Amino acid sequence: MFGSMQAVYRIESKYIIDSEENYCSTFGSKLHVTARYEKERDNYTFIINRSAVLLNGKPAVKLMDRIMSEVGNSLYPIHLRVSPRLWILDILNFNEIKQRRQQCADDWKAEADSPELERYFRFSEKNSANGKTLIASLYRDTFFNLYFRDIFTPTGNDEARLIRWQNFPERETDQSYLYQVKPEDADRIRLSGEIMKIVPEHNGTFDTVYETGDQGEIRRIKGRIESESEGTRYMKQWTLETETGQIAKQGYKSLILNE
């Protein structure tokens, strides 16, 4: 039976409009992940912490970036209950997180005040109103949207799954993609598909490769989404990989299959 898993990941995501020369921004951080199987519940507990947050390769400097970074960091550590197929079911320390976020917001409100800041805090409070809304907000984050997803169950030839990318191609917009899960070999799984044609003039693709270790543990996730509309091309790229020697031998796939 699965005992535990520990890993340290470094993630970097890059947002590009038309080309890197036109507009490009990057976000990076370290994610510290611990997981254990709970036999009596037949699910898993994940504890996630975050450090070394960088915007365009540097710590946040602008006031709004600093506020968003600190409010984002108040989410951690986060304790998740996760289903056997890797979907997030519950946030076990929700009340603790809500108190941290409120304290962070109160501290900044006492120091700075602006209409933009008020809008941001209203949005943040709405996202953390209850466990369900906070889980939904987690899936707006690249790491959670890719990591907590059933990648070990292949799709059939006529089957497609849905992934939604929020704040893409632009802030306060979202796009959905239908994709298939195809194992390429023993340690590579590809998720690929196309944008849902809700808006006919939008075109786009989703392509991501997961690389796993000997035990099936996730070692690397590398991929991108693209969208094109009215001659403008938007792209988001990401790379998530473990730091050398920082993942347990008992692996992630074993955690899923050893039910």
Where do the model's predicted regions map?
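Acidic, serine/threonine-rich low-complexity disordered tracts
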Residues: 1-83, 146-259
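Solvent-exposed helix/loop surface patches that form functional interfaces
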Residues: 88-192
